[in-house]
Amino acid sequence: TAALKISETNGKVLRYGENPHQKGFFFGDFDAMFSKLHGKELSYNNLLDVDAAVNLMGEFKNDAPTFAILKHNNACGLAQRETLHQAYIDALAGDPVSAFGGVLISNKEIDKATAEEIHQLFCEVVIAPSYAADALELLKGKKNRIILIQNETEMPEMLVRTCLNGMLLQD
C-alpha cells in the first residue's frame, strides 16, 4: 500500500509553468540536493532539465570525467574522456545547436580550462560537484547563468508521475 500527500502550502511558486501563460509550482526540497551559487531563479523547464541531467549523470557518478548537455529533457551531448575539458568539448560536438540554452552537468570539479569553454556558450544551468575558484569566478561572468553544486544526497526511492486522471508510482 502506498500513500501520497502533497501540501500546497509548501510549494514554491515559479516564474511560470512550461509556458508563460501557465502557473508553475515546485514541491520538494531543492536545497537538500543543490547549493545555488549564482544566477536567476530556476524555471519550471530548468527544473525538468536539471532532473533529467541528475538522473543521467547518476549513471556516471564514480566514473572517469564525464560531461552531459541536456535540452528539453533530452541529452544532446555526452562524453567521457581522460580530462573534463575534453569531455566537455566532445559533449558539445554531439549537437552544438541544441546545446544553446541548455543544462550542463559534470561528474567532476569544473576547472578553469573547462569553464573557459563553457563561458563561450549560452547555457541556462551548470551543475557540478564543485568548482575551482577561478572557474567559478569566470562562470559568474554571466549574471543570469544558474550555477549549482550538486550535494551528496540520495535520489527519492519512488518515482511519481501523473497519468490520465491519476498517478503512477514506481520504485
Residue positions per predicted region:
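Active-site loops and adjacent core secondary-structure elements that bind or stabilize anionic groups
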Residues: 1-138, 142-171
